[in-house]
């Protein structure tokens, strides 16, 4: 079996359907003895340029190991699903399991925000004790 990286973008009005879509697609992959190496739901993001007069889309990234028949089936599902506005399937040389730069940046922002909140709380506590 070969390794693939799959990214698909869902219409922003259909964001609530994304978990069901992910479950359906991962079920098709694992049902054919495939493996999911990485699954990231990037959420709703701004598009670089409008697609069908849309400026935002819900992004999902999958790194999988699956037979070609399953990949063909997924591409057909993407093509005929009106909620999927764009998709891309790329073959990779090996399984990618580390977090993507998108998730790493999000985690770093979250850590900085938490550190700032802790520092602010510590400063407020120190200010209360001086009075």
UniProtKB/Swiss-Prot annotation:
Composition-biased stretches (Acidic residues): 120-131
MF terms in GO: small ribosomal subunit rRNA binding; structural constituent of ribosome
Top-rank taxon, per record: Bacteria
Keywords: Ribonucleoprotein, Ribosomal protein, RNA-binding, rRNA-binding
Stretches for region Disordered: 98-131
Database matches in SUPFAM superfamilies: Ribosomal protein S6 (SSF54995)
Coiled-coil blocks: none
Pfam families referenced in this protein's UniProt entry, alphabetically: Ribosomal_S6 (PF01250)
Any one of the GO CC terms: cytosolic small ribosomal subunit
Basic and acidic residues bias spans: 104-116
Gene3D superfamilies: 3.30.70.60
Annotated GO biological process: translation
Task of the protein: Binds together with bS18 to 16S ribosomal RNA.
Family: Belongs to the bacterial ribosomal protein bS6 family.
Official protein name in the record: Small ribosomal subunit protein bS6
Species: Citrobacter koseri (strain ATCC BAA-895 / CDC 4225-83 / SGSC4696)
């Amino acid at each position: 079996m070969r390794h693939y990286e799959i990214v698909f973008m869902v219409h922003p009005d259909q964001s609530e359907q994304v978990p069901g879509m992910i479950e359906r697609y991962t079920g098709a992959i694992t049902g054919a003895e495939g493996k999911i190496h990485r699954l990231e739901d990037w959420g709703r993001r701004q598009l670089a340029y409008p697609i069908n007069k849309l400026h935002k889309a819900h992004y999902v990234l999958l790194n999988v190991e699956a037979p070609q028949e399953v990949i063909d089936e997924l591409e057909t599902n993407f093509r005929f699903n009106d909620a999927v506005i764009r998709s891309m399937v790329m073959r990779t040389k090996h399984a990618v399991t580390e977090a993507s730069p998108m998730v790493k940046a999000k985690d770093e922002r979250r850590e900085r925000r938490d550190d700032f909140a802790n520092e602010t709380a510590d400063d407020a506590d120190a200010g209360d004790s001086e009075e």
